[in-house]
């Protein structure tokens, strides 16, 4: 990607000159689409795939790290949540835990003391990255039932 396109995509993201579509985030001036999905499975069962919502703060972060001058964070971590509120474009790192209803209990949630790390492999000839080489997992602990309504990718490993 050339430097000029990098600058205009960054400017358009900061000025909210993009469209959120079912397929992802589309920059209409440039014909550029940013999208993703996540895969999950329970107890090694059938895999399910779900489209990702990329909130504004996350999009700006991706652009700053990938084509801007911001340093890549030390790690990425998965945060499970069970709130009834659907993920939204205005979710941020600062409001995530309360808004999403992050699962923080070690006895009625999952037993990891911190959020599990997401360790992706670099893309080689594909247009995506995955963590199949180092799959993140959690052990659920509950006396009844835990509902997980979503998973977020964050740069801090501390729960809540």
What is each PLM-predicted segment?
Residues 1-150, 155-160:
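Small cysteine-rich, disulfide-bonded extracellular modules of the LU/uPAR three-finger superfamily
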């Amino acid at each position: 990607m050339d430097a000029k396109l990098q600058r205009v995509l960054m400017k358009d993201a900061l000025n909210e000159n993009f469209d959120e579509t079912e397929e992802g985030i589309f920059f209409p001036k440039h014909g550029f689409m940013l999208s993703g999905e996540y895969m999950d499975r329970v107890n090694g069962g059938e895999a399910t795939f779900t489209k990702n919502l990329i909130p504004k703060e996350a999009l700006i972060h991706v652009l700053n790290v990938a084509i801007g001058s911001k340093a890549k964070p030390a790690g990425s971590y998965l945060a499970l949540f069970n709130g009834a509120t659907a993920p939204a474009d205005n979710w941020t790192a600062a409001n995530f835990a309360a808004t999403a209803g992050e699962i923080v209990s070690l006895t009625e949630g999952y037993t990891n003391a911190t959020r599990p790390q997401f360790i992706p492999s670099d893309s080689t000839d594909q247009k995506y990255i995955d963590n199949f080489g180092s799959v993140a997992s959690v052990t659920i602990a509950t006396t009844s039932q835990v509902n997980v309504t979503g998973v977020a990718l964050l740069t801090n490993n501390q729960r809540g």
